[in-house]
């Protein structure tokens, strides 16, 4: 299995208590090599203000969000391994984990898995796409040793 090259950038006011780089690497490696040989992904961990600004600029949503995915579009005729960027908001991930009663580490893992699938072209706009994407997320999360992230919705 090929390994994903990770460029981890921490842009939070306080970076203490964040997952280790090795954890981010493990989570990426559980997803991307199944679909693509050589890949490079940037993960940028930000605070609420940056997430809010990016979400408003790129999605027209006036609030912070847990994860944004920015796939890299390779120009025709060029071969590059850059898959794209994930921007994850620390405070939103922490708040969601608490509200949903999920272990924080598991929710971080889920955000990386979810965002990575977006980089690979998966989406959840249509119901059938959402079902396919959620099934993949669940399969990957279980393989990583975490619970089904959608278990509460299925009960």
From Swiss-Prot:
Keywords: Cytoplasm, Endonuclease, Hydrolase, Metal-binding, Nuclease, Ribosome biogenesis, rRNA processing, Zinc. It is found in: Cytoplasm. Single strand-specific metallo-endoribonuclease involved in late-stage 70S ribosome quality control and in maturation of the 3' terminus of the 16S rRNA. This is Endoribonuclease YbeY. PANTHER family: ENDORIBONUCLEASE YBEY, CHLOROPLASTIC. Zn(2+) binds at residues 114, 118, 124. One of its GO terms (cellular component) is cytoplasm. GO terms for molecular function: metalloendopeptidase activity; RNA endonuclease activity; zinc ion binding. It holds the Pfam family YbeY. Its main location: cytoplasm. The keyword Nucleotide-binding does not apply. One of its GO terms (biological process) is rRNA processing. Its cofactor is Zn(2+). Its EC number is 3.1.-.-. Binds 1 zinc ion. It comes from Shigella dysenteriae serotype 1 (strain Sd197). Belongs to the endoribonuclease YbeY family. The gene is ybeY.
